[in-house]
Amino acid sequence: MKYINVRGCNGSGKTTLLRCLARDPLCRVINVIVPDHKPIPVTYAPDGIAIIGDYTPAAAGATTAGLDRIKTQAAAKAVAELVGRDPDVKAVLFEGVVVSTIYGPWQEWSKANGGMIWAFLDTPLEVCLKRIQERNGGKPIKEDQVADKHRTIARVRDKALADGETVRDIHWETALKDIKAVIENLG
């Protein structure tokens, strides 16, 4: 099992967490080509970690880094599979708020690809709302929509657990330490 899907609602810290894994100056970004999609950047860290999207410090100003910038689930799955076939890659990480709310198709994909770790950030809703507010300069946000996503993702976590999927909870205050432990414990 080498796939790790970091899940959480808007403002939970998904992108920030993966950016922390890509701070090494030796990280490189390679554009990967999959059918019916423009090139998709993948960040390769020297320790065998690949992250779908450009998470390097140079891309920190980008609004969307992960799967949310990929137009279709088919393309997202194709790039993850392609990167996962690289024998030098020990872990493929990906995140996105849209994928965080979807269960069935990703569970099927997980089963077809040797399993996936469902890594859920447990960031409290109030913290998510505060972060979103700060990031968009204090403009009003639709708090009810964020709360709905927060609840939906909690239900997805419960469903994954009930179905016997490999679920890991990532504590929002120790997220980097927690995700590194998940990576370290890959089979």
Curated annotation (Swiss-Prot):
Catalysed transformations (reactions): 5-hydroxymethyl-dUMP in DNA + ATP = 5-phosphomethyl-dUMP in DNA + ADP + H(+)
Keyword Kinase listed: yes
SUPFAM superfamilies cross-referenced by the UniProt entry: P-loop containing nucleoside triphosphate hydrolases
Biological process terms in GO annotation: symbiont-mediated evasion of host restriction-modification system; symbiont-mediated suppression of host innate immune response
GO molecular function, one term: kinase activity
Domain of life: Viruses
Keywords noted in UniProt: Host-virus interaction, Inhibition of host innate immune response by virus, Kinase, Restriction-modification system evasion by virus, Transferase, Viral immunoevasion
Physiological role: Phosphorylates 5-hydroxymethyluracil (5hmdU) into 5-phosphomethyl-2'-deoxyuridine (5-PmdU) on DNA as a step in the pathway leading to thymidine hypermodifications in the viral genome. The phosphate is added internally to the DNA polymer. Also transfers glutamate to 5-pyrophosphoryloxymethyldeoxyuridine (5-PPmdU) to produce 5-Nalpha-glyutamylthymidine (Nalpha-GluT). As a final result of the pathway of hypermodification, 5-aminoethyl-2'-deoxyuridine (5-NedU) substitutes for about 30% of thymidines in the viral DNA.
Family: Belongs to the thymidylate kinase family. 5-hmdU DNA kinase subfamily.
Name of protein: 5-hmdU DNA kinase
